[in-house]
Amino acid sequence: MIYKFRKVNPITWKNDHVVLIDQTCLPEEYKTVEISSYEEMAVAIKTMIVRGAPAIGVSVAYGMYLGARETVTNDRNEFLKQLEEIAVIFRRTRPTAVNLFWAIERILKVANKTNGTVKEIQEAVLETAKKIHQEDLETCKNIGDRAVEILPTKPEKLNILTHCNAGALATAGYGTALGVIRSAWRDGRLGKVYADETRPRLQGAKLTTWECVQENIPVTLISDNMAAHCMKQGLIHAVVVGADRIAANGDTANKIGTYSLAIVSQAHNIPLYVAAPLSTIDFKISDGSEIPIEERDTKEIYQVGETRICPKQVEFYNPAFDVTPAELITGIMTEHGTVLPGELEQFRVKQLV
C-alpha cells in the first residue's frame, strides 16, 4: 500500500451535491462518493460511508437540504410536512449519535422560522447546513487547542492512547480526540499515538492510523486487549477518546470497548478524557441508562473481509457502543474548556447548548 499525504476533508459541499470520503474503503483505497439525494445520504450514514457523531451531524444537515430541494410543492405547510417526513427517515439511521438529532432539529427550527417562499426556506436550510459544517471545524480546533493545556505536564512528550476514530474523518476535518492529539503534535507535546484496533469494524486500525500517516504523526497500533498491558509497562501517559452522546450527568456513550478502557485506565492511575463538542451533550437525558444503544449487523462480528472466522452454529451480540460512567472520566474536553463530568450543567445555564 502506497500512501499519498493529503489533507483530510471527509465532507465537501460542491455546487449542488455532497462529496464524501468513503470510509468503508480505507485504508486500501481512497475513494469518494457523490451524494445528490437525501435517500443516498441516509444510506451513506447507515452503512458508515460517513461516520462519527460530528460528521454525521454535518452530513445529515446537508441531507436535509437535499430532501428540501427535492420537494415538489410551493405550499409552505405541505413543504414543512414533507421536511419532517424526511427527518423521520434520518432519525432512524444511527440512533446513538446525538449530533444527528441535534442537526435535524436545528434545520427544522430554521425552516419553521423562515418567512417567505419555499425557495427562500430551501436557501435558508442550505446556509444553515454550511454554517454547521464550518462551525464544527472551528469547534474541533478549539477543543484541541484548549485541551493541550490540561494534559499531564510530565513527561514532556506524551504517549496518548485513543480508541476507534475520533479524528478528521469523524468530524468536519480536524477531529475531537484526534484533534487534541493533532494540537499536541503541533505544540511538541506528543511522543506518539497508541491506537486501539477497535473491533469489530477496526476503525482504529483502518482510519486512525491512516489519518496519522497522512500527517506523519508517529502511531503504534495495538489490539484492544493489549491496552492494560501497555499501561502497566508505562507506555501510556493519557487516554483521549471521543463521544457519540453524553448524558447530563457526564455518562458517555462511545464506541464499544471504551468502558473497558476506562476501567483499566483508572486501575493504572492514567487520566482518561472525553473530547466532544457541546452539541454531543444531551441534557434531555439524566444519565447513561437512557442512551439508546445501536445494535449492528452480526456479520461485523463473524466475518473479516470475505472470511468467516467461527462456526455457523454460534450466536452473536453486536452493540456498537457502550456507556462509560462519569466517575471513570477525568474530564470532558469541550470547545469552551475542560470540565469535570458533573459540571456540565453550567453550559446549559449559560445557554451555550
Swiss-Prot record:
Q: What class of enzyme is it?
A: isomerase
UniProt KW Acetylation keyword: no
Query: Reaction catalysed?
Result: 5-(methylsulfanyl)-alpha-D-ribose 1-phosphate = 5-(methylsulfanyl)-D-ribulose 1-phosphate
Q: Where does substrate bind?
A: 51-53, 94, 203, 254-255
Q: What is this enzyme's EC?
A: 5.3.1.23
Q: Which residues form a coiled coil?
A: none
Q: Which domain of life is it from?
A: Bacteria
Read off the Pfam families from this record: IF-2B (PF01008)
According to its UniProt record, in which pathway does this protein act? Amino-acid biosynthesis; L-methionine biosynthesis via salvage pathway; L-methionine from S-methyl-5-thio-alpha-D-ribose 1-phosphate: step 1/6
- Tell me the active site: 244 (proton donor)
Concerning Gene3D superfamilies, the annotation shows: translation initiation factor eif-2b, domain 1, Translation initiation factor eif-2b, domain 2
Q: Which GO terms describe its molecular function?
A: S-methyl-5-thioribose-1-phosphate isomerase activity
Site residues by UniProt (Transition state stabilizer): 164
**GO biological process: what's one of them?**
L-methionine salvage from methylthioadenosine
TM ranges: none
Name the NCBIfam families for this protein.
eIF-2B_rel, PRK05720.1, salvage_mtnA
Q: Which family does it belong to?
A: Belongs to the eIF-2B alpha/beta/delta subunits family. MtnA subfamily.
Briefly state the protein's biological role. Catalyzes the interconversion of methylthioribose-1-phosphate (MTR-1-P) into methylthioribulose-1-phosphate (MTRu-1-P).
The identity of this protein, by name, is Methylthioribose-1-phosphate isomerase
What species is this protein from?
Answer: Trichodesmium erythraeum (strain IMS101)
State the organism's lineage.
Bacteria, Bacillati, Cyanobacteriota, Cyanophyceae, Oscillatoriophycideae
Q: Give the gene that encodes this protein.
A: mtnA
